[in-house]
Regions:
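Short intrinsically disordered terminal tails
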Residues: 1-4, 48-51, 152
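Catalytic cores of nucleic-acid endonucleases
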Residues: 19, 85-88, 129-152
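Nuclease-adjacent, charged terminal/linker segments that flank catalytic cores
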Residues: 19-23, 29-30, 49-53
Length: 152
């Protein structure tokens, strides 16, 4: 599957209304809310052979993109160290920070597949939460959802 097709299917199947994106820049932690994850923020990568070596979309930001997001209004919400103090996994730590900022209790890890809803609901809006370096979706998951919807 090509990157463009994977992005199109991801957007078509996503249960999120918007996205909360996080990244570290010069040791500060930022977040920004966006309607869509832009294609230039995504790369096609392969998971490790230990995890099956499957192709996937990965959320990746270089410094130029981080600077652009800061100019567009990304807010500083902490430091890189804050990500390490909450949990062993930076992505989980970021999600917990977003829950805490919004006065909510975190959901159990990976309790909802991306096509069924977001990671957090804020005022009736479903948001997916992604920290720089996070997996967006494996191509095989997109294929599985396609087959499920065709047979439904």
């Amino acid at each position: 599957m090509k990157k463009e097709n994977a992005i199109r299917y991801y957007r078509k199947f996503s249960g999120a209304d918007a996205y909360i994106l996080g990244f570290v820049y010069k040791h500060d932690l930022y977040c920004i809310t966006v309607d869509e994850i832009m294609p230039r923020f995504m790369r096609v990568e392969k998971s490790s052979s230990k995890k099956g070596g499957h192709e996937k979309l990965q959320f990746r930001l270089n410094n130029a993109l981080k600077e652009q997001l800061i100019r567009k209004g990304a807010e500083k919400i902490g430091t890189e160290t804050d990500l390490l103090e909450i949990a062993g996994n930076k992505g989980v730590s970021f999600e917990r920070m977003i829950y805490r900022i919004n006065g909510q209790e975190p959901r159990p890890k990976d309790s909802v597949r991306f096509d069924k809803g977001g990671d957090i609901n804020i005022n009736g809006v479903e948001y997916q939460i992604k920290l720089d370096g996070a997996q967006i979706v494996e191509f095989r998951t997109l294929n599985k959802i396609q087959k499920e919807r065709k047979s439904a």
